[in-house]
Design a protein with these regions (language model features):
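Chalcogenol-based redox active-site neighborhoods
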Residues: 1-133
Length: 133
């Protein structure tokens, strides 16, 4: 679960700025740091204590918590329980992609919290659209 509310605000701003020219989606993938797996201190500090979902319904419930907690404005899609999207896009624990209308990956951040850089993503979007940053 994306936990940084400042980053979520920025993602919403970027999507709002370009929503007339492209579609934006967030895909909820497997939980990176579940309580019944590899829990990390910053999740405990932020009161993010979730078990890994075992059904698509449980995954949907956690995704809804993420949307509400972070005020995510873009549609939230769910990865399936085989983690197909995560596997195809090496998305765990979090990652930003820019995929053009032909399905070609035009930009991707480095996987993980240290590579999750909304400004780099925003710059790639403006470059692809040919608009000033």
């Amino acid at each position: 679960m994306l936990t940084n509310s400042k980053q979520a605000v920025r993602l919403n701003e970027i999507a709002a700025q370009h929503k007339d020219r492209m579609d934006f989606y967030c895909i909820y993938i497997q939980e990176a740091h579940p309580e019944d797996g590899w829990q990390v201190q910053h999740n405990l500090d932020d009161d993010i204590v979730l078990n890994a979902p075992t059904t698509i319904e449980e995954r949907a419930e956690i995704a809804e918590v993420c949307v509400l907690r972070l005020n995510m404005e873009m549609p939230m899609l769910l990865d399936d329980m085989t983690d197909q999207a995560d596997g195809l896009y090496n998305a765990l624990p979090e990652r930003l992609y820019l995929i053009d209308e032909a399905g070609i990956v035009r930009f991707k951040t480095v996987a993980g919290a240290m590579g999750f850089k909304p400004e780099d993503w925003a710059n790639a979007i403006t470059e692809l659209l040919g608009v000033p940053a």
